[in-house]
């Protein structure tokens, strides 16, 4: 599961991981793509309210009494299911991190964090309300967007602290330690991004 506030550069990190470490990427399609200049863009399925899938993913505890229906929703955009890991992307998982940890065992939760103001500014630079994919209507307007970015960062911090984990800088060393050695070059633009990978055990 990939979790990060808008503008946190979470999409770029998700693409870097899924394209270089043998992930299931059969959810990609021309309709599920947004490219903006040098911005890495959006690719593949995104979940959350007002989006194509997972309209109730901002209220997991109230919407999902069991694992099966949630799993079916997560699997639904993938043309082919296999043993390869899938990257399930949702900003609003921030509101249900404890539920994910307690109910979806044997998985990983990758949280991505960046300064709130920088996140908002980058989201606007990448297109803001003109971003064609995914749909950001749930965030309403600039004022609400800034509030939600703040809130999602705070909830991620609380979760990381409560599970006894720590944030780390997203760099080559962290990537190699957590996903295996690679020849990936991480752009300097990610130097202000922090990450935390949390395992949910059986």
Ranges and model annotations:
Residues 71-79, 181-182:
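Short amphipathic alpha-helix with an adjacent loop that forms part of the alpha/beta core around
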Residues 81-191:
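PAPS-dependent sulfotransferase catalytic domain
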């Amino acid at each position: 599961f990939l979790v990060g506030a808008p503008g946190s550069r979470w999409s770029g990190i998700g693409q870097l991981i899924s394209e270089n470490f043998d992930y299931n990427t059969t959810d990609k399609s021309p309709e599920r793509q947004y490219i903006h200049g040098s911005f890495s863009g959006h690719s593949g399925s995104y979940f959350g309210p007002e989006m194509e899938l997972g309209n109730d993913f901002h209220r997991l505890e109230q919407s999902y009494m069991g694992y099966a229906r949630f799993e079916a929703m997560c699997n639904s955009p993938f043309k082919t299911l296999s043993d390869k890991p899938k990257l399930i992307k949702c900003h609003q998982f921030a509101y249900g991190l404890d539920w994910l940890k307690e109910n979806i065992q044997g998985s990983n939760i990758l949280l991505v964090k960046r300064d709130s103001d920088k996140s908002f500014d980058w989201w606007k630079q990448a297109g803001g309300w003109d971003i064609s994919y995914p749909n950001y209507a749930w965030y309403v307007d600039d004022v609400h967007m800034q509030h939600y970015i703040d809130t999602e960062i705070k909830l991620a911090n609380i979760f990381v602290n409560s599970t006894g984990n720590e944030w780390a800088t997203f760099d080559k060393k962290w990537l190699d330690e957590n996903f295996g050695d690679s020849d990936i070059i991480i752009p300097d633009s990610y130097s202000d991004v922090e990450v935390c990978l949390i395992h949910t055990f059986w």
